[in-house]
């Protein structure tokens, strides 16, 4: 029995405790994907490659946005159409005064809180703007591809 206790202690000595947060800070996923340089993507790829990468990813995003957008617009429009048919047939009674009152209340609430934008949102917008400025070629390719994806 004494031998097992000594084995357990020696096994504990073989393992090293790793703090995952420190490891994650030192080994970021984008470093493995894009390389160790944290500068703009323009330093790593040619202009043609950047435009191609941005264009292809933008086209995919635009195409998906178009397809999903059509589906959502059809669902919302169909829901409004069914609501109007049910209202006209007498199945549903809509109190339009109450709807107008609630809409006006929501407008006032939005106007009051619009000036107090969340700091996370401001930080995200600033980071996005900085990314676009540093990677203008790939961003331009993405926008062009996105518009082509919407059109196709």
Swiss-Prot record:
Subcellular localization, as worded in the UniProt entry: Mitochondrion outer membrane
Q: What does this protein do?
A: Acts as an activator of hypoxia-induced mitophagy, an important mechanism for mitochondrial quality control.
Q: Which UniProt keywords apply?
A: Autophagy, Membrane, Mitochondrion, Mitochondrion outer membrane, Transmembrane, Transmembrane helix
UniProt-recorded name of the protein: FUN14 domain-containing protein 1
Check the record and name the Pfam families matching this protein. FUN14 (PF04930)
Which Gene Ontology biological process is one annotated for this entry? Answer: response to hypoxia
Record motif YXXL, residues: 15-18
* Keyword Mitochondrion in record: yes
TM helices/strands, residue ranges: 45-64, 71-92
Q: Please give, as recorded in its UniProt entry, the membrane topology of this protein.
A: Multi-pass membrane protein
- InterPro entries hit by this protein: FUN14
Organism (species):
Danio rerio
> What's this protein's family per the entry?
Belongs to the FUN14 family.
Q: Which gene encodes it?
A: fundc1
Can you list the GO cellular component terms from the UniProt entry?
mitochondrial outer membrane; mitochondrion
């Amino acid at each position: 029995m004494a031998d097992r206790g000594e084995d357990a202690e020696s096994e504990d000595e073989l393992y090293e405790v790793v703090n995952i947060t420190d490891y994650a800070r030192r080994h970021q996923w984008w470093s493995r994907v894009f390389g160790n340089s944290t500068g703009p993507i323009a330093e790593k790829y040619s202009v043609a490659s950047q435009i191609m990468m941005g264009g292809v990813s933008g086209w995919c995003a635009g195409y998906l946005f178009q397809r999903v957008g059509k589906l959502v617009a059809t669902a919302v429009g169909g829901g409004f159409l069914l609501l109007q048919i049910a209202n006209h047939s007498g199945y549903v009674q809509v109190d339009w005064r109450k709807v107008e009152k609630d809409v006006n209340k929501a407008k006032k609430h939005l106007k009051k809180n619009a000036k107090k934008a969340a700091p996370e949102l401001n930080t995200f917008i600033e980071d996005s703007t900085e990314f676009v400025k540093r990677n203008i070629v790939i961003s331009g390719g993405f926008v062009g591809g996105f518009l082509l994806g919407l059109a196709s």
